[in-house]
């Protein structure tokens, strides 16, 4: 097809502003789905995506649309995730487009994550078409929200499209606006082939399926292609487009979006954001924008049953294919045995990975509390990055201890300002600015230690603001801090998986609360169990879990006291011996309790 009749666009929207419903509306308006095939959130094909109502993986669909100018257009929708943890996925999807539809809920207005993605789209020089969705709601305020978009985003909203994806209002207007406003791709089919990978996943039958946006040249079935970042060559076995079901083709030309299957078995050969080129005459320069993603949050994942260790490795390998941002390495814990230290983009990402491992691979897992990466300068001048508290050097060897800071942008209704400011102050935050967008909505900017964010910041923000506040964060750098390692000892033995790094000012309080929490969660034993919180050799809190006692004197009716004493002494001896060799089982809830302890 002539590139001038191709349009590539994506939809930017906050969670719950109706992006997936709008995508469903576009599919049915262009006749891509018959009534029999329709189901809600058609593009969210992961069970978890439907259940949580969020888009996790990027998807693509090619729509044929006959415009009012009489021409047939090929419109490629590249669906993007909206959550802050997946911003790299969003940036790759946006790099594959020339335009974006900004969907804003006419009742709720602009949210923090929408803004972050709009700025990404602007950096990629995309044509942005604003759309007010859910216009049929009684609480919709189209004029107010249109003004808010003009003020916060700086887009001209004079001819803003009013739509309701659910009631099928304004869908054709959106399609016409895409044809009219989004520029056709700049495509030269005579050049050396180059294509941008914006997603990939593992299929049990075909191997790796790679989603690409052709930028230059042509790739045909049977061609030898090269992945530039990993320097691997493969032959194209199958290729085509999603309409929305796979439609096989023999060629993909510049400007088009489609999939390529090469029978790739090794997950690590395909990096999202990489460039595909011809193996015979490779391009000299890859496409801009590829970056290896650095995980920001780390946690240990261990199988409950040790024999599941190999299955966990296979499962992580398979997930890594769909999720290039997940990293993992072997970790050995004295308390939990062998497992993996996994790196994630953020907390939602961590939850989703854990849930997918349990759901799709039927694994029973224990996850330790998440930690962030710290930077330590030792007394001998060497630098180290610390991902796991158990690897922390002795305090006398540390010259400088730095922790990562993030810039957090919060959008909230004015009613909840007080609670949110208190939460940020509790979390050692430094206020940067506060700006009223309207008389009912305010933007607050804080600089926060990332360590405080990974604990329970998001949950508490949502409960303080009854779910109305939204947040967006970006990493700003490392700063020196007074941090210590807090150990939890059970019967004098440090449980490595329960160690965490905290600010010295909070250590005493956090240690006491944790010891109390452990006392509630650890089941009582036949002997007394001491639960202690310690910094180095100094014990800062202690709780004692009482023993379960069997009444050994029950069978003595009356009689001599020395008989009873003998039985009690014998019981005491037994308990002492038991305590010496006994092993206390720590339940999964205890590992998660670290997250839920509020200072």
Curated annotation (Swiss-Prot):
Gene3D superfamilies in the record: 3.30.70.240, Elongation factor 4, C-terminal domain, Elongation Factor G (Translational Gtpase), domain 3, P-loop containing nucleotide triphosphate hydrolases, Translation factors
GO biological processes: positive regulation of translation
Superkingdom in the source lineage: Bacteria
Ligand binding (GTP): 16-21, 133-136
Top enzyme class: hydrolase
S-S pairs: none
GO cellular component: plasma membrane
Pfam families (alphabetical): EFG_C, GTP_EFTU, GTP_EFTU_D2, LepA_C
SUPFAM superfamilies registered for this protein in UniProt: EF-G C-terminal domain-like, P-loop containing nucleoside triphosphate hydrolases
Enzyme Commission code: 3.6.5.n1
Protein purpose: Required for accurate and efficient protein synthesis under certain stress conditions. May act as a fidelity factor of the translation reaction, by catalyzing a one-codon backward translocation of tRNAs on improperly translocated ribosomes. Back-translocation proceeds from a post-translocation (POST) complex to a pre-translocation (PRE) complex, thus giving elongation factor G a second chance to translocate the tRNAs correctly. Binds to ribosomes in a GTP-dependent manner.
Listed HAMAP family: LepA
Cited PANTHER family: TRANSLATION FACTOR GUF1 HOMOLOG, CHLOROPLASTIC, TRANSLATION FACTOR GUF1-RELATED
Full protein name: Elongation factor 4
Species of provenance: Bdellovibrio bacteriovorus (strain ATCC 15356 / DSM 50701 / NCIMB 9529 / HD100)
């Amino acid at each position: 097809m002539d590139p001038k009749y191709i349009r590539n666009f994506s939809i930017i929207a906050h969670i719950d502003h109706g992006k997936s419903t709008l995508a469903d509306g576009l599919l049915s308006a262009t006749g891509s789905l018959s009534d029999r095939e329709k189901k809600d959130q058609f593009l969210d094909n992961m069970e978890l995506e439907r259940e949580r109502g969020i888009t996790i993986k990027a998807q693509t669909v090619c729509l044929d649309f006959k415009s009012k100018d009489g021409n047939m257009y090929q419109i490629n929708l590249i669906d993007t995730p909206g959550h802050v943890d997946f911003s790299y996925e969003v940036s790759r999807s946006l790099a594959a487009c020339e335009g974006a539809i900004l969907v804003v809920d006419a009742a709720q207005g602009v949210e923090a994550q929408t803004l972050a993605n709009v700025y990404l789209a602007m950096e990629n020089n995309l044509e942005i078409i604003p759309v007010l969705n859910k216009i049929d709601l009684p609480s919709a305020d189209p004029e107010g929200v249109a003004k808010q978009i003009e003020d916060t985003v700086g887009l001209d909203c004079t001819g803003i499209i009013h739509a309701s994806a659910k009631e099928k209002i304004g869908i054709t207007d959106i399609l016409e606006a895409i044809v009219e406003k989004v520029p056709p791709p700049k495509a030269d089919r005579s050049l050396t082939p180059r294509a941008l990978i914006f997603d990939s996943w593992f299929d049990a039958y075909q191997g790796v399926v790679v989603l690409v946006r052709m930028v230059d040249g042509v790739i045909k079935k049977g061609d030898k292609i090269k992945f530039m970042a990993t320097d691997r060559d493969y032959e194209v076995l199958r290729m085509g487009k999603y309409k929305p079901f796979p439609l096989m083709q023999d060629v993909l030309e510049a400007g088009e979006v489609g999939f390529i299957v090469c029978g790739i078995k090794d997950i690590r050969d395909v990096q999202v954001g990489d460039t595909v080129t011809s193996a015979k005459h490779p391009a000299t320069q890859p496409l801009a924008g590829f970056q290896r993603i650095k995980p920001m949050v780390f946690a240990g994942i261990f199988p409950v049953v040790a024999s599941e260790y190999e299955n966990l490795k296979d499962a992580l390998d398979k997930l890594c294919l769909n999720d290039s941002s997940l990293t993992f390495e072997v970790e050995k814990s004295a308390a939990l045995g062998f497992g993996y230290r996994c790196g994630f983009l953020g907390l939602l990402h961590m939850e989703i990975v854990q849930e997918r491992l349990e759901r799709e691979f039927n694994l029973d897992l224990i996850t330790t509390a998440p930690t962030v990466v710290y930077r330590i300068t030792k007394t001998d001048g060497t630098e180290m990055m610390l991902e796991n508290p158990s690897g922390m050097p002795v305090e006398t060897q540390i010259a400088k201890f730095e922790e990562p800071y993030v810039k957090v942008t919060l959008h909230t209704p004015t009613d909840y300002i007080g609670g949110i400011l208190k939460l940020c102050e509790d979390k050692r935050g430094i206020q940067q600015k506060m700006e009223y967008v309207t008389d009912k909505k305010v933007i607050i900017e804080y600089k926060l230690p990332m360590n405080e964010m990974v604990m329970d910041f998001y949950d508490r923000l949502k409960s303080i603001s009854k779910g109305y506040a939204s947040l967006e964060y970006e990493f700003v750098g490392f700063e020196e801090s007074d941090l210590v390692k807090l150990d939890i000892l059970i019967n004098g033995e440090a449980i490595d998986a329960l160690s965490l790094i905290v600010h010295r000012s909070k250590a005493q309080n956090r240690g006491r609360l944790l010891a109390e929490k452990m006392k509630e969660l650890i089941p009582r034993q036949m002997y007394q169990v001491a639960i202690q919180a310690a910094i180095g050799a100094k014990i800062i809190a202690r709780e004692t879990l009482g023993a379960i006692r069997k009444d050994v004197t029950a069978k003595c009716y009356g009689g001599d006291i020395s008989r009873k004493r003998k039985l009690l002494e014998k019981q005491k001896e037994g308990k002492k011996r038991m305590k010496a060799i006994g092993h206390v089982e720590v339940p999964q809830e205890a590992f998660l309790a670290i997250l839920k302890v509020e200072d």
